Amino acid sequence: MAEIKNYTLNFGPQHPAAHGVLRLVLELDGEVIQRADPHIGLLHRATEKLAENKTFIQSVPYMDRLDYVSMMVNEHGYVLAIEKLLGIEVPERAQYIRVLFDEITRVLNHLMWIGAHALDVGAMAVFLYAFREREDLMDVYEAVSGARMHAAYYRPGGVYRDLPEAMPQYKASKIRNERALAKMNEARSGSVLDFIDDFFTRFPKCVDEYETLLTDNRIWKQRLVGIGVVSPERALQLGLTGPMIRGSGIAWDLRKKQPYEVYDRLDFDIPVGVNGDCYDRYLVRVEEMRQSTRIAKQCIEWLRKNPGPVITDNHKVAPPSRVGMKTNMEDLIHHFKLFTEGFHVPEGETYAAVEHPKGEFGIYLVSDGANKPYRLKIRAPGYAHLSALDEMARGHMIADAVTIIGTQDIVFGEIDR
């Protein structure tokens, strides 16, 4: 009898569900996946090498472009590594602002994930709902940094500036009447902090809407339950982190286990799954959005009561004020040195990790005492998750591969870097 060969199929990189530039070579028996071979490197931009030729502060915007839906959290890992080597203290207000924006970024990421994941599986409505809320948070990004995506807001020693007192408002146009305009600007009449507070007050109801559409939906459960199961032991061996390992029942979260900034002062829970399948990972991420709301509310309350500096007063690391520069020669010299040569970081090596929306995002930084990193190694969570795809997809249908890629929450900016 003739031997039947397995069928080989290329999935991506021009595939709408490939999340960027993923190329999978699938070995199929009928429609069942026997092997999934991910081919990466199509979005490689040599970020680590570029960082070796730029001063420490010039590399902050490169971090935004790694995982381009979780911009500020990438910056956070990088500035933490620099601060560790410099041994500088970050003002308390700056730490709270960082934590607040980490959680805003987490919500931004999970909204993008739930919208794209649902769209891949075939649910169109959730995508539109999620982007309605993302728009408000993008406006917050724009209000503090001037950019909707690549903010470059965090700095070694603090943040670029304090939260502005006024929130940008919608302007009158031909397509909006007075009443519609007044309604749109209702929440924007106060400060940026007021706007964030208003957003997180109404956000839990929005999460309820997503859950109404998906959680008990028959088709959603048929597509997710029992798909891509990873046991707790295997999750540890594969190096999974973030919602991927928590979905398998392991309560590992750097915000609790290795607290950084002010996370040890905040009250929140770690959602954990039971079965380790796509459905549990979905539930974990939805609950994470609720926990981020809790954290953000606590940060807002603290920030209202405690004004103060938002960046270190060490002018060898952070620029002096404009007023100081115009009156004080020393400040002018500091400013000039900072933006031409940059600051020198003491010799040594360090690893700083943050709880990124996708998992553990780590920066391994080696300094030889110069004004540039000697070596910068990025530990991207998606890289470990993608390497587990072959194991997770075996024995499933082609359509389930799309579900598994969606549940891994893959963004190629950080995998290929």
Curated annotation (Swiss-Prot):
Tell me where in or outside the cell this protein is found.
Cell inner membrane
GO cellular-component term (any): plasma membrane
Q: Which GO terms describe its molecular function?
A: NAD binding; NADH:ubiquinone reductase (non-electrogenic) activity; quinone binding
Q: The organism sits in which domain of life? A: Bacteria
Q: What is its EC number?
A: 7.1.1.-
Keywords for the protein's UniProt record, in alphabetical order: Cell inner membrane, Cell membrane, Membrane, NAD, Quinone, Translocase, Transport, Ubiquinone
Q: What is its main location?
A: membrane
Cell inner membrane among keywords: yes
Q: How does it sit in the membrane?
A: Peripheral membrane protein
Q: Which InterPro entries match?
A: NADH_Q_OxRdtase_suD, NADH_UbQ_OxRdtase_49kDa_CS, NDH1_su_D/H, NiFe-Hase_large
According to UniProt, the reaction catalysed is: a quinone + NADH + 5 H(+)(in) = a quinol + NAD(+) + 4 H(+)(out)
**Annotated NCBIfam families:** NuoD, PRK06075.1
Known partners and oligomeric status: NDH-1 is composed of 14 different subunits. Subunits NuoB, C, D, E, F, and G constitute the peripheral sector of the complex.
Belongs to which family?
Answer: Belongs to the complex I 49 kDa subunit family.
What is the protein name stated in its UniProt record? NADH-quinone oxidoreductase subunit D
Origin species: Burkholderia mallei (strain ATCC 23344)
